[in-house]
Amino acid sequence: MKGLIGRKIGMTRIFTDEGISIPITIIQVEPNIITQVKSIQTDGYYAYQVTTGTKKPNLVIKPEAGHFAKAGTKAGRSLWEFRLKHEEKPINIGEILTLEYFTNIKKVDITGTSKGKGFSGTVKRWNFHMQDASHGNSLSHRVTGSIGQNQTPGKVFKGKKMAGHMGNKRVTIQNLDIIRIDLRKNLLLIKGAIPGAPGNDLIIKPAIKLSH
């Protein structure tokens, strides 16, 4: 198995026996139900597809309803896929994956969607230095400045840092410590901050690059 889907609840802190404050993010990991198993023969690669949570019946479109019915499960919030390098131990449709998977894992990689900040200037978006506040400067305090040269090359280079939509992007944070696991309440307590607003879905995987 490669990972699970969870939902960000929010942040708080806990104290160690020595009185040290640790900032933590609380993630609710409801049971993940396998809805499809893919193989080289049928799909060209190995993977398993999961769903979690619930969705109002009036929001489930017919293709989704048929897919969930074929898997013998209720409609979940969405569908996620975890690709496998090779065929692992048998995974069955309808099988339930729980937080117990992480009981012997100390570090995880978590992927989420960062908070959207709307259209932002270069000072906020890229941490550009502001121009002079006075000394003849007028109306150009937060202006980007030059974005290129002249006739040669006669263009703005691709990737130039400029104003634009900030946030609302897929972000992965690696090597996050697992502080505590509550199997009874399906809660995963992670040290530090995680991208996204409370309520966002998160992809949780065992750390691929363990730090020493």
From Swiss-Prot:
Modification after translation (UniProt): Methylated by PrmB.
Residues the record lists as N5-methylglutamine modifications: Q151
Keyword rRNA-binding set for record: yes
SUPFAM superfamilies reported for this sequence: Translation proteins
Entry's Gene Ontology cellular component terms: cytosolic large ribosomal subunit
Bias type Polar residues, positions: 139-153
Region of interest (Disordered), ranges: 139-161
GO molecular function list: rRNA binding; structural constituent of ribosome
Keyword Transcription regulation annotated: no
InterPro entries linked: Ribosomal_uL3 (IPR000597), Ribosomal_uL3_bac/org-type (IPR019927), Ribosomal_uL3_CS (IPR019926), Transl_B-barrel_sf (IPR009000)
UniProtKB keywords: Methylation, Ribonucleoprotein, Ribosomal protein, RNA-binding, rRNA-binding
Any Pfam family the entry gives: Ribosomal_L3
GO biological process, alphabetically ordered: translation
Family per similarity comment: Belongs to the universal ribosomal protein uL3 family.
Record function comment: One of the primary rRNA binding proteins, it binds directly near the 3'-end of the 23S rRNA, where it nucleates assembly of the 50S subunit.
Subunit structure: Part of the 50S ribosomal subunit. Forms a cluster with proteins L14 and L19.
Name used for this protein in its record: Large ribosomal subunit protein uL3
Organism: Baumannia cicadellinicola subsp. Homalodisca coagulata
Source species taxonomy: Bacteria, Pseudomonadati, Pseudomonadota, Gammaproteobacteria, Candidatus Palibaumannia
